[in-house]
Amino acid sequence: GQAPYDIVFGFSNFINDWRQYLAPVPKKYMNSTEMKDVTKSHVGVSSWDGTMYQYPVDGDRHYLKYRKDVIDNPEMQKKYKADTGKTLKVPTTWKEYGEMAKYFNGWDWDGDGEKEYGSAEVMKKDDLMFAAFFSRSVAYAKNPRTPGGFFFDLETMKPNINNPGFVEALGDWVEATKYVPPGGINFGLGDEIGSFGGGQTLFSFSWDDAFIAAMQDDS
């Protein structure tokens, strides 16, 4: 019969299931002005086997947010070096993130008269915790040294959730419960936004909302 819809809006992770019903994106749209600054990675997730089936509208990226007044502070850098023997800088691994978050957890390091904490994260069950866990696990389970699928083995479709990468990430996340604010293990996205955006933590990672909140005059 006749297809009831001309356009379908949905997540790119369903693209292989949907593509039998979809027409490739017309070249005039692929070459449009709006597409000029779309990154190759976002074009890639909108495509299957080299053919673009979806037109990206939301990058949906996770960002690392950090307190510049701490990380870039020479006095804090000196203190951190003296106490830990390590360099205080923007972390590039989850291990560095955890070490710094743990060090800055539970004391008033910005002089506002209140305790600050290491990290605000979405940890609430049945909320968006799955997305937060993927950000942690992808560094171990999907990188140039771990080719193939992320969720499944591409040859056998065996779930990868119990592989060393996911297990390592889960261990990190259990450790992270020690450097979040009180009640942090029940933080949903709104709580994470309010916590980092309100100046309560050194780090957070998720979408850009908490960064925007941190830029407000009352933060």
Question: Which stretches of residues belong to each language-model region?
Answer:
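Extracytoplasmic/periplasmic substrate-recognition and gating elements
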Residues: 45-46, 50, 69-70, 74, ...
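Glycine-centered hinge/linker elements that transmit conformational signals in sensory
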Residues: 96-103, 132, 136-186
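Early extracytoplasmic/lumenal segment of secretory-pathway proteins
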Residues: 1-13
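Hinge/lid segment of periplasmic solute-binding proteins
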Residues: 10-65, 72, 132
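Short helices/loops that flank or line small-molecule/ion binding pockets
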Residues: 1-4, 71, 96-104, 190-204
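Acidic carboxylate motifs that coordinate Ca2+ or other divalent cations, activating on Asp/Glu
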Residues: 112
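Short, solvent-exposed loop/beta-turn-alpha elements that line the ligand-binding surface or hinge
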Residues: 27-38, 78-90, 109, 124, ...
